[in-house]
Structures are given as C-alpha cells and as structure tokens.
C-alpha cells in the first residue's frame, strides 16, 4: 500500500524553491532552456518555466526529451548501427545555452546519463544542470543534481511515485514497498 509523503501544497513549495534557486545561481535567466525528461519531467519543466515567468517576467523555452533509445538497457539501432534519435522536441538552438534538465525522480542516475547522451546529439550547451523533484539516493553513476525539491531516502525495495495534475489528475508523491 502506497503512503503519501508529499502533498500538493508541499510539492508546489518545492518547485517554487527550485525556481528561486535557479534564479539565484544564474546571472540572469535569458540564457536558460528547460528540457524535461519524458514524461513527468516535461510537466515539471513547464511548471518551472511558468513560475520563473511569474517571478522574473521572462519566457524560458521548454523542450522535451524521450530518452528511451538512449537507455543502456535498450538496444534499438538502425541498419548502420547508429542509435536512432527519437522523440526530442527542443524549440531553440541549445548551443551556448545553459540547459537545465528536469526529471521527477533521481534514483540510479541511468536516466540522466541517457538524457545527457540524447542532449549532446542536439548541440553543445555552455552548461548543463540537473533539477529533480525527488532525490531518493542509491546512485549507480556519479551524477548529482544541482536543484532538488525533496530528498526522500528510500530502501531499494521501495518505489517512489510522483503524481502530477497534468498527467495523473492530482499532485503528490508516494512511496510503496515493492512486491517480492
């Protein structure tokens, strides 16, 4: 049975705090691009951009990445042996920009590694930062987020689920013990 660990109001506050941290750590926000990792990372990137516009009056472009074909547990290649680029919607040239990758949960780091590979196929940003709503620990790769909504330590036999209004009909974060 899942137990809610973050409600909608706490989630909103965490996203607002991330937005303030992004503003504070950047000399202006005109060079930023948010890129959400499919699926919930896209909605979170859009929310961060909306909040940033409310606070700073600046429209920050928002793009999306589907990293399915870049995962190290997926082996789809075309006839030439090249990984197929799939599902990226990046509305601006990212060369020389500060890209902030956005995802819902950081766990092993493998999704972020795949996103970095996919992103580099689209250009060469001046800087890449990582914003996550939840950092649950248990990294398998040396990846550390720059902006964290909530640190939620978990056991390996637990699953963190993020619900977003745009996708799930409500906001919240819950933890559930996996079946053995």
Curated annotation (Swiss-Prot):
Q: Which family does it belong to?
A: Belongs to the purine/pyrimidine phosphoribosyltransferase family. PyrR subfamily.
GO MF terms, alphabetically ordered: RNA binding; uracil phosphoribosyltransferase activity
Q: Which GO terms describe its biological process?
A: DNA-templated transcription termination
Function as written in the Swiss-Prot or TrEMBL entry: Regulates transcriptional attenuation of the pyrimidine nucleotide (pyr) operon by binding in a uridine-dependent manner to specific sites on pyr mRNA. This disrupts an antiterminator hairpin in the RNA and favors formation of a downstream transcription terminator, leading to a reduced expression of downstream genes. Also displays a weak uracil phosphoribosyltransferase activity which is not physiologically significant.
Q: How does it assemble?
A: Homodimer and homohexamer; in equilibrium.
Listed as disulfide-bonded, the cysteine pairs are none
* UniProt keyword Membrane present: no
The source organism is Lactiplantibacillus plantarum (strain ATCC BAA-793 / NCIMB 8826 / WCFS1)
Classification of source organism: Bacteria, Bacillati, Bacillota, Bacilli, Lactobacillales
Listed InterPro entries: PRibTrfase_dom, PRTase-like, PyrR, PyrR_bifunctional
Question: Under which EC number(s) is this enzyme classified?
Answer: 2.4.2.9
Give, as one word, the top-level EC class.
transferase
Keywords, comma-separated and alphabetical: Glycosyltransferase, RNA-binding, Transcription, Transcription regulation, Transcription termination, Transferase
Q: Where is this motif: PRPP-binding?
A: 99-111
Q: Which reaction does it catalyse?
A: UMP + diphosphate = 5-phospho-alpha-D-ribose 1-diphosphate + uracil
PANTHER family (UniProt xref): BIFUNCTIONAL PROTEIN PYRR
Q: Which residues take part in binding substrate?
A: 39-40, 103-111, 136, 160
This chain's protein is named Bifunctional protein PyrR 1
């Amino acid at each position: 049975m899942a137990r809610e660990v973050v409600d909608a109001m706490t989630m909103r506050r965490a996203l607002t705090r991330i937005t303030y941290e992004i503003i504070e750590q950047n000399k202006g926000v005109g060079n930023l691009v948010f890129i959400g990792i499919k699926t919930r990372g896209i909605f979170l990137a859009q929310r961060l951009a909306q909040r940033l516009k409310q606070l700073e009056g600046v429209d920050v472009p928002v793009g999306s990445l589907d990293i399915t074909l870049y995962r190290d547990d997926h082996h789809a290649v075309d006839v030439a042996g090249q990984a197929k680029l799939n599902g990226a919607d990046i509305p601006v040239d990212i060369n020389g920009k500060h890209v902030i990758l956005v995802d819902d949960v950081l766990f092993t780091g493998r999704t972020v590694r795949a996103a970095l590979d996919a992103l580099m196929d689209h250009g060469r940003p001046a800087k890449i930062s990582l914003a996550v709503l939840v950092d649950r620990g248990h990294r398998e790769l040396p990846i550390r987020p720059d902006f964290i909504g909530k640190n939620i330590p978990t056991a390996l036999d637990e699953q963190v689920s993020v619900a977003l209004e745009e996708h799930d009909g409500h906001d919240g974060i819950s933890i559930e013990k996996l079946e053995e």
